[in-house]
């Protein structure tokens, strides 16, 4: 598991939380738009409360990088503010005082995921203030052919090794 953040302070906070929880996490200072990690090196990429703090074009660039980082069949999972709730409650946008929250609220994480190449895109409400969005990097035709004779998901995942997660 690798945690990535642009903020050195948040990396220190995350390291302390991981230590207290007894988790072995490698934390890296870096930019989610250009991580420097090799292509297809992660099975899962997550982003938590990131996109409402970025301009939409930056969010789209980050999603393109997530797509690049994922193996075929890999999944991106995004937890962020509920866009539908934010669109319907202007007062809530004013409370957060985030410079890009209005643009985020008017956008669509689903559309951004689709434009980045993700399939099976789905967003679900998580309570009334958050949403969880998911997308899958489509399987390559070669990987589909390799998996045709497998009888269970366990067989497919056994070959994947140890999945890694990037927290942005």
Predicted regions and their residues:
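A short SAM/SAH-binding and catalytic strip from SAM-dependent methyltransferases
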Residues: 43-57
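Core SAM-dependent methyltransferase catalytic element
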Residues: 116-168
């Amino acid at each position: 598991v690798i945690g990535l953040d642009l903020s050195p302070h948040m990396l220190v906070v995350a390291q302390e939380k991981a230590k207290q929880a007894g988790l072995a996490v490698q934390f890296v200072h870096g930019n989610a738009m250009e991580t420097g990690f090799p292509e297809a090196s992660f099975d899962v990429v997550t982003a938590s409360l990131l996109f409402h703090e970025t301009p939409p074009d930056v969010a789209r660039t980050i999603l393109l990088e997530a797509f690049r980082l994922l193996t075929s069949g890999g999944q991106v999972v995004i937890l962020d503010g509920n866009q539908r709730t934010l669109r319907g409650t202007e007062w809530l946008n004013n409370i957060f005082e985030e410079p890009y929250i209005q643009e985020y609220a008017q956008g669509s994480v689903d559309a951004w995921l689709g434009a980045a190449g993700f399939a099976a895109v789905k967003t679900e409400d998580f309570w009334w203030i958050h949403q969880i969005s998911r997308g899958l990097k489509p399987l390559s035709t070669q990987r589909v052919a390799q998996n045709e004779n497998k009888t269970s998901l366990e067989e497919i995942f056994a070959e994947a090794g140890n999945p890694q997660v990037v927290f942005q």
